[in-house]
Amino acid sequence: MTDTTERLPRALPPGTSPPERIEIDEFVLRRYAPDDDEQLHEAIAESYAEIHQWMPWCVDPVKIEDRRDFIERAALDWATGAAFNYGIFAADLRQIGAVSLMDRIGPGGLEIGYWLRTDATGHGVMTRAVTRLTELGLGLPGITRIEIHCDEANLRSAAVPERLGYRLDRVEDDQAQAPGDSGRTMCWITP
């Protein structure tokens, strides 16, 4: 999928952001802190085989320096309103995934992106996290739609918006960026 961050106007007014911490049942979505680098690294390293198939940023070797760089960029993105990146943490404080609310699809819309640690899949964690971020996103000023973009071959990722009642708005030809990509991006949109 082409990054349109620089070409499209922001959807959110300056200074607008969702909460930094969101509690959901037995887990919490929390804005990244600088000392989350080791947990983030561990979650990605342990789930590399699955995440690498769909996320072009997940490369071998998995390096902690890349996680530190991401957390620094995430802090800047939060401050500018470009993206709101959350770690998903279980009750035992272990990171089990990540979810982001991104202001990169133009006026009126935000995009949600996500990944989940392999051993945390199949328990409804991502469905509940995306449900809550969808509700929060639609409650922000000027936001009328939320989109989820994923490769057509990534059936597990596509199952989340489908379960939540998003509708498949379009499928776009795109350049494959990760090993599992088909080169076709599904764009799901809130009804």
Where do the model's predicted regions map?
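Conserved GNAT-fold acetyl-CoA-binding loop/helix
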Residues: 52-72
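Acyl-donor (CoA/ACP) binding surface of acyl/acetyltransferases
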Residues: 1-39, 43-50, 85-191
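Short loop/turn motifs at secondary-structure junctions and domain boundaries
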Residues: 76-81
